[in-house]
């Protein structure tokens, strides 16, 4: 994992720590993963499609149950990343859960500030339901900003009377755009990927003219009651630690089933190193097992 952490720091954190924040540079470095070698599960099929007017990729592992689905929102601070660059992560979770994953190419800020990504998430979620996937057979998956988008989508679904998914698996979710102090400062040096120096710029790029404290932007600022079971994975060395721990605490206080698994000293989004890093394989197996069980099927693992 040291090489993975070093590469992530050099590619992303160095751009986030530069004297001036060049969002285009940050985006390019976040997206370089799509050009790096990756290994996908044997027998995986990739099917580009459009759902609710949004470009998506269906990732269907061999032996998957087609009566259920997982909708995946990628990370990237709302300004970068893509379903393509995070395909390996989504594909290996799909294999572990024996469930097709719909990876969403939502619109990015600053060209498309809030509510563009949020609207895309809701459109795809609604389209998957309309296609006949029962809510009890539907899960959500999200990492970093995509984790925040997943929780925001669940809040909105509840508020609008749309059926909620059966469960959500979240990787180091960014859940409070207004947060300061705490792990944001305590882990500023130890976080191998993220940096605070231009955090306000990223928030402004996504929030635009909207209040970043709005629950659909910062789900930890909202009422979590009624949400489905959630599994959260986070590293103790990253600046988003407080978001994950806060979701567990606030969720349990609201009567939810939320488990936050804390991993020691790993880089942000270490799961994206699957299948090369053993820590990533173990984490992805856990994510897949959680979703597999919640969506009603025996568990399958990552090799």
Q: What residue ranges belong to the model's regions?
A:
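A glycine/proline-hinged amphipathic helix-loop "lid/cap" segment
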Residues: 1-64, 296-303
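Alpha/beta-hydrolase superfamily serine-hydrolase fold, recognizing
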Residues: 47, 52-303
